[in-house]
Amino acid sequence: MAVLFDICRTSQTKVIIFQKTNLRQLKPKRQFMKDAKQFLQEANAVVPRISAADGIAKHGAGNSLFIDVRDSGDIAKSGTIAGALRIPRGFLEFAADENLPYFNAGLSKDADIVLVCGAGGQAALAGKTLKEMGYQNVCNVGGISDWIAAGGKSEA
């Protein structure tokens, strides 16, 4: 028996492949679009998550580069890690590309980079992006509230 497939586009242009089992009945086979949960799972699989205590130890050693990927409005509300670079998630690719005039000279592909955000999700996504751009030593310390609660140094 030959297997037939149909492709259907939804109103949101999501492409779904259906396997025909009967001319009247179609079963979804797989979707080509990812959702936020899938992006986060992929990011968390390649960007190690460290505890606030481990992040504080790295901060104290002085050998790591801390980057807050939240926007300035969020940083103004809760502060950030003392000495952290402030590179919003939406601008990271431009700031991390050595070939662009927007490159942030504070970044180095050999640096031990520790990312922070509001809860950990943006930092994970940012870390995956940095790894794909050639930055190898990247980790996610999670959210700023955990950092502050653990006694980490912060600034406005």
Segments predicted by a language model, with ranges:
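Rhodanese-like catalytic fold shared by cysteine-dependent sulfurtransferases
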Residues: 19, 28-64, 72-112, 119-156
